[in-house]
Structure formats: structure tokens, C-alpha cells
Amino acid sequence: MPLLHQALLDLMSSSGLPESFTIADFGCSSRPHHPLLAVSDMTAFIYKRYHELGRSPPELWVYLNEFPGYDFNTVFKSLPDYLEKLQEEIGSNSFRPLLYISGVPGPCHERLFPSKSLHFVHSSSTLNWLSQVPPELSDRENPLINKRKVFISKTRTPEVIKAYQAQFQSDFASFLESRSEEVVPGGRMVLTLRGRTTPDPAPDKSCLLWDYLGQALQDLVQKGLIEEEKLDTYNIPYYEPYTEEIKAEIEKQGSFTLDHLVINSIPWCEKATTTAQMIGNAATSTTVHEELEIGSLHFGSEIVDSVFQRVSEVIALAADDTKQEQELVCFAVSVTRK
């Protein structure tokens, strides 16, 4: 059984099938083509469970969280189709879902909901994005400027790694602290994020994607499309944590019990037989595209398409040279509010 379903089943079992659920889903924009994918999965599982047990459908209050400025209208326009498919999946016209969905803009590292109002929290990739670039790297007079690099790399200084680690730890602690106020005792959270299985991030595969982006940006500097100074002052507010970092922060914050931490390896491109160019396109279709949207404020929106095209080419060449498909490590973390 998927970890998400197991956590929902445990919640329903421990709470005695309540008449209403409140769910918060963080990071629907990380699924640009299917923003309601996780919500569809969760609500269908809950309603089918109630239907199987002969219980009346519970009221489900679902809050979608995204960064300020995100256009929730795109999601809301898809609701009629989603509700129709949900009814079909339940398989009973007499069992009518009672579902209320709303959008809540705001940073996930801060309080967003009333105290003890959430029964279940789901987060997809949101926690990889830092609230800011580590301050030590954004100060032009500071020697920690990550010159010609956009992220942690093999040639980085130890201080660069420490700066990223400290920022992630601070952000993750703030997320846990905020949710500890909002989640009811016995409530669950399932957090999915990319990570790594080695303590040192520099040689890990988690840096590869950003190394390729850095190479693409350097190529555009050489072509005169990007100013070198802009590249030198550009750092990605993103971090893929080590497993022990996740465990340590959960234990340190103290409000949640760690139930499960599952590690999965996922390919950049689903089929091993795909061409190198397809691998390049697949790898840049999500995370890098999100970063380029942010980077457009730094480099200018007119350069985004050129960067996206070049980084796809760089990844395709790397995939062709290595003759093997690159994989990403993904964590699924399940916790219970004490």
C-alpha cells in the first residue's frame, strides 16, 4: 500500500471515521499538468473507504497552498471534471461526495491555518525550495560568493555547503513548528521531497541537475547572452537533504513522531529506452522550469527560453555520453502529531 494511503488509513482508524476531514495540500504547482493529482488520490481513497464500510460520506475541506501570486483559477476551472471523475471512481451515484476546495496563498514556512484545524497535511516537493538564498551567498562583499556556480558543486568551499544546510534546517524547522500549531493531535503528515543518501552533497546525484544548469548558463555567458556578473551573483534557493537531516529536525522540533521514511529512486525519464534528447527534455520539464521562472527575475524573462533549451541539450549530451539513465532520489516521510 502506498505510504500516502497507509497514513490516511491509520488516521481514519485512529479517529473512528469522523464526519469531517480537513486536508492541506502544499505544492500543487509542482504538478503543473495535474495540480489536483494528490488531492484526487486522497479524496478518492477516503470516500471509497467510507463507502466500503457503509458509512455516510464525510465532509472534506481541502486547502490548496501555493506561493503568493500563484493563479488558483487554473485549478478551480478543472474542478467540474475532477468531481465527475471522483464520482465515477467511487462507483455509486447514491454516495455523493461533500467536498469543499479553496486556495490559500502564502509561504509554507509560516502559519497559514487556525490552531488545531488540520487532520492531514500533504506536501509535494515544496520543502526542497528554500525561503531564500542563504544570506552568506547573496552578500557581494562576502567571500562566500559562489562564483560561476549556481549551487553546491564539487569545487565548492565547505562554507557554501554549511550555508545551504543551515538555511534548509531553519526552513524545515519553521515548517514543522507552524504545522505543529495547526495539526490536531493524532493528525498525520506525508511529505515527499527529493533528497540524497550520502552525507556530502557535492558528489551526490542531487547536484547533477544544477551542475548542468550552471554549465548552460556559462555557455550563454560566453555567447554574450548573459552578463558574467549576473551569473556570479545567482544562486538557486533549493536543497536536497540527507536522510539524517530530516530525522534530526523532526526529533529536534519534538511535536511529531516519525512513522516512516521511504527512499525511492526515480528516473528522469520513465522509459529506459528513450533517446538522450527525450531524457534532457524530461529532466528539465519540472524542477528546472520552476527555477527558471524564479531566475527570470534575475536574468530577465527574455532569456528563459534560451536557458531552458540549452540545459536540455547539456543534459541530453551527458546522458548520451554516460550511456545510462540518471536517477533522482525521492523521500516519502510520514509523521504523526503527538
Each model region followed by its residue ranges:
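A Trp-anchored, charged/polar loop motif used as the substrate-binding/catalytic surface
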Residues: 1-12, 102-107, 161-178, 241-248
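A short glycine-rich, Lys/Arg-flanked "PGG" loop and its adjoining helix->strand segment in the class I
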Residues: 119, 128, 135-185
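Amphipathic alpha-helical interaction motifs in eukaryotic regulatory proteins
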Residues: 5, 9, 43, 47, ...
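Short catalytic micro-motifs in class I SAM-dependent methyltransferases
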Residues: 125-126, 250
